[in-house]
Structure formats: C-alpha cells, structure tokens
C-alpha cells in the first residue's frame, strides 16, 4: 500500500501553518478568559437527532453521517453551538446563570471544498447562556470585534441585524408556509431578481412588499432603520427595530461602533437564531470570517429553556489574512560536540533559561555543523554552540 | 488582494456589446474594450474600475471567490453552477429559454412518456433538477456542443438546451416540448464585496435597476 490519498476537503497542517493557528488560539483563549468565559469540549460526533435540533434538518446533505452498532445514526458535528446547548441542558441545570463558555474546536461539513472552505474546519467561539437583552448581545459582539483586533486585523466590518424584524413581517404576512420559505430563501441568497418577481405575484399589502424588497439591500448606519415603511404597522417588528437600535447604542458604549454596520440582509443560515444576528467580513477575503447571534429557543429543545447568544470565528479563513502575525519565538540554539554528556548539560542549561535548543544527535564535527547551519540563520537564531 | 478598485467580470461573446451599451448609459468607462484583443484586464484609474474578460461560464467563479466584486452573466450559467453569489439586477438583454425538445416525429409525446428516456444536454444540473421536480427518471447525457446532433444520431431521445429564436431546433427537425425556464443577463455580486464596497456598489445597482426597468439612470 502506497496510497497517499486523503479525503477531499481535508488537509495536513505543517509547522508554519500550525504556528499561526496556535497564535490565534492563544489570543482567542486569553481574550475569552479575560471576559470570564471558560473552556468546554463536546464529542466530535453526536446523534443525528441532536444535531438536527440546531440545523433543523435543512442541511442533511452537508452532514457526515454514519451508524453505530446499535443502529443509531451519528453525525460529525457541523457546528459547536448545538452540542454546547445539549451540554448545558445536561450538566448545567443547577449552575448559576449567566454561564460563559468558550471552545476551540473542529467541525465537519460535506461542502464543495475551495480556498477558505474545508470539510474539516476550526472555530474559536463563545456562548453566553442564560442572559436576555441587549447588554448580553453587545458583550458577545464586542468580544467578536476584539478577537479580530487581537489577532492583528483592523480592516473589517461586523454586519448587524435583528432577525425578528424579517420574521415578524413574514409571519404576519398571511402567506402560506411554502410562500414564506420561498421568500426566506430568496432573501437569504439575495436573489433580488426572483424576489421582486415573486413579491409582484403575491396578494399582500403593497407597503409590506416594498419593505420585504428593500430589506436584503438595506445597509449602512443606524439611520437605515428609518427606511422601513411597513414596520410601524407590526408591533413585533417595531419592537425588534427598537431592540436593534439599543444594541447599536450599547455597542457605542463598548467602543467598537467603528466596526459595526447595520445590514438587514444578514439572516444567517441556521434555523436556531431568534434575535440579534451578526457576521464579520474583511475586504481582503471573499468569504465571511465570523458569525453569530441570539438563539433563545435552542436550549428549550433539550428540555432546558434558557436564552442564549454567541458567535464562532472561522480560524482557517482568518489564517489566510494573517500573513505575518507577530509570532513570538524564543531564540533557538544548535548545540553539538564530541562529549555528549557536556552537550546535554549545556542544552539543559539553555533550556532552563527559556531558550529552544536543538542538539546534534548525529555526532557531527564543528565544520559539518557550521555547513548545516548555512541558510538556517532565521531558524537557529541563537547560532551554533560547540562544546 | 484588496484594493479600492471595483472589479467587474464581463462575459466575452454575445453579451459583451449590450453590456458595454448599458455601461455607457451608466457613465461607466469603456473605451478600448473588446474581447478580440489580447488584454484580459482593463483598468481605469480615474474611475477606480477594473474589468476582466472571462468566458461566461467562469464569471460566477470569479465573483464567488472574490477575484471580482461584480459580474455580468446569463441566468442560465448561474442556475447551472449554483454558486454562492448575490443576484442583484435583471438586465433584461440576452434573452433565451431552457427547453426540452424532441424530434419532430414524436412531437405529440407527453412529458410522462419521457420517463426512463435519455436527454442530451450541456446543462446537466438544470436538466436533472427539472426532470426530478416532475417526478421523472431521465438519463442525462452530458455533451459539450452540437446537442442537436444527439437525437439525430440516436444517442438521445430528447435534448435540454438553450433556445433564443428556435431556428437551430427547426433546422435539425426538433420541436420544443416544454419550457423549463427563461434566462436573461444578470448582475451578480460577491457576498463580502457587497458589504465592504457597499458605497461603490449600491448606487451602481440602483442605477442599473432603474435602467433595466425602463427609466433612465
């Protein structure tokens, strides 16, 4: 057997890539911890019925499915939030809320692989469980902004929306389930051409049509909320707009407003979101960097009703933007010599001082080692010590 | 790599001329562009606009990956490729329609009689989705051109193809059995560019919408 194949969409990570990854993980973990979040881990695969509590069964073709020997259907986790909701509903029933949890984990989706989209992907994320309201939303969004900043990114935007605006308008539209699903998917995919055609054919209030048609393209500062003519007629939508304003104002207090835009087209793909939602983008990459929002009903599906909000940051994508992160590395020495006991002693001494030491295990002469060092000055920054 | 130019992927071929006419009306630069020259990139520094010349089937790829912010391409290509891009404006020109066509000799056949028959097409995704949505099992034979030849030579019982005037069908003694969908030219947009270059893109979209719905920009 000489097969060197790996399954499509997977990859090996070599030291240079892994250094960047660990750098990101350390920054993320330190930031999350500074906001009093604590790390959790959930199993890499779960029962399909658990996974679909979160995904709603819409993305079954994206799941890696297999069976256990008792006939249960299992899925590699396609995201982390559902597993953490299950974890909280199982283990944290008696805990004091709000609970703040974070994770650094891999998830799996059977997607078309391309740059920045792999079938195994790594995320850093947080979940704030048991807190309602705009302050909790603002905390999570603030941490998202700071996470990107900590990792050295400054040119990025977080698009902010309140999903209940769109949902309330659609719920009260008098349309049937099929029509609603159709409009939802057209708005999510920003197929404006088909959307305007479908709206044209529907028998609903003209102002409502106009509002639904404008939602996917409404983008800008908080003032864009004035451009929703129909919202005044829908109490729930109006309340959601008011909440979005409050989140925006709170983010001003948090000092991150420079990175925030209101974007009514952000609906997020997963079924579980209920309130404030957001996504992060950099102009240097054609794909989103992070996404999250409020999901107040998910824990209830596991028998533990509890409001929640959170986000996940795609580390594979972010790594593409961090070409030269300020990686700290200890000076590295190469230690060699005839007397191996002396070599070991010297190496230990240097290691104790915090240096990285590579010892010559091949018993080479000074000249040979000097030759070996040529071209590796960037790596062996401390140089050669021959004892 | 990021720059503040707006990059637009243009479809070479029949769509180019009407596209440039629209651009002219929108006061977008366009001097010297043609798809005959060797240049594939046209840059206009004053206007901060860049055009790239692509095969129509490549336009959604450039836009999805963010190598271009916007693209001009037919709905037929968008549907066949199912790329993750925003579809912003129907530019109306470049009309054609997807049809199922059969040889004249069996023109009175009904759709359900096509179950378990063979269809030749350049658009396997559209063909497959259509037949499935009708509850039919049809064997799709993917060809790269001259689809009309397939039924003549007994390779397929029918074809799924793009038709604009219907002349080619007639010349090959094929008749349109059913229309699957209409297609016109669309403006598509990268998901992220739409957000990060919103101030450049949104006015352009609005002007195009006005223009294509009959008003003037």
UniProtKB/Swiss-Prot annotation, chain B:
CDD domains named among the record's database cross-references: PBP2_HisGs (cd13595)
Alphabetical keyword list: Amino-acid biosynthesis, ATP-binding, Cytoplasm, Glycosyltransferase, Histidine biosynthesis, Nucleotide-binding, Transferase
Gene Ontology cellular-component annotations: cytoplasm
Enzymatic class: transferase
EC number(s) per entry: 2.4.2.17
Domain notes: Lacks the C-terminal regulatory region which is replaced by HisZ.
Subunit structure: Heteromultimer composed of HisG and HisZ subunits.
Family, per entry: Belongs to the ATP phosphoribosyltransferase family. Short subfamily.
The name this protein goes by in its record: ATP phosphoribosyltransferase
Organism name: Syntrophomonas wolfei subsp. wolfei (strain DSM 2245B / Goettingen)
Gene: hisG
